[in-house]
Regions:
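Hydrophobic residues positioned within well-ordered beta-strands of beta-sheet architectures
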Residues: 7, 27, 138-140
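A solvent-exposed, charged loop/short amphipathic helix patch at secondary-structure junctions
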Residues: 161-184
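Active-site-proximal beta-strand elements of phosphoester/diester hydrolases
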Residues: 23-36, 121-123, 148-158, 172, ...
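Metal-dependent active-site segment of extracytoplasmic phospho-/sulfohydrolases and closely related
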Residues: 192
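Extracellular carbohydrate recognition
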Residues: 1-13
Length: 192
């Protein structure tokens, strides 16, 4: 098992957050491989789900279409709807603004919003050769009713073994928790 663990935190339901004029609703979700399970349905289930929660800002991890509908067969690049189609998709749930963060593979993060978005920085590489930010990151600025909000998007390395480790060495790398160490490296680089 790998991942981040936080001890001594109590989580309590405080009830539903109202739609007051000073509240900002943010939805941050990993939609897994560009939501390939809803592609054949024109993303109608996804749009209905987002509308149900009516967020002001959304951040979507893995926001590129990479597989054919509901399969693990690669989608031809020319047939991929996302990430280029985010403006059209976001408009269906009421978001007029979109921005795709830095990405170097098939797993970008996309931010959509009811408010203007400015991309401050797209991040794909770090200051160490051979150690990129595996799925990219971005620093985005959203202006909400005259207030500036900076949002950092990051989708860390997901494997138990370290980034770039060959298949013959992956078990040993996982045993040494190199995947966790790589995630820590990515987070520290982004936050520095």
């Amino acid at each position: 098992m790998h991942g981040f663990y936080v001890d001594n935190i109590e989580v309590r339901a405080l009830g539903e957050m109202g739609r007051g004029s000073d509240n900002l609703r943010v939805l941050y979700w990993n939609i897994q491989n560009g939501m390939w399970s809803d592609q054949a349905n024109n993303y109608n289930n996804f749009v209905a789900w987002v509308k149900k929660y009516d967020p002001d800002i959304c951040v979507w991890c893995e926001s590129a279409t990479i597989y054919k509908d509901n399969t693990n067969s690669a989608q031809a690049s020319s047939a991929r709807f996302l990430p280029d189609g985010w403006a059209a998709l976001a408009a269906r749930y009421g978001h007029a603004y979109t921005a795709v963060g830095g990405w170097r593979d098939n797993y970008p993060q996309t931010i959509t919003s009811k408010y203007p978005i400015e991309t401050l920085l797209k991040i794909t590489d770090s200051d160490q050769a051979g150690k990129p930010v595996s799925h990219g990151a971005a620093i985005q600025r959203v202006t909400v009713k005259g207030r500036t909000i900076n949002i950092v998007t990051l989708h860390t390395w997901p494997q138990a073994y370290g980034f770039g480790v060959g298949s013959a060495d992956q078990a040993a790398s996982a045993a040494n928790k190199e995947g966790d160490k790589y995630r820590e490296f990515e987070i520290k680089y982004i936050c520095a």
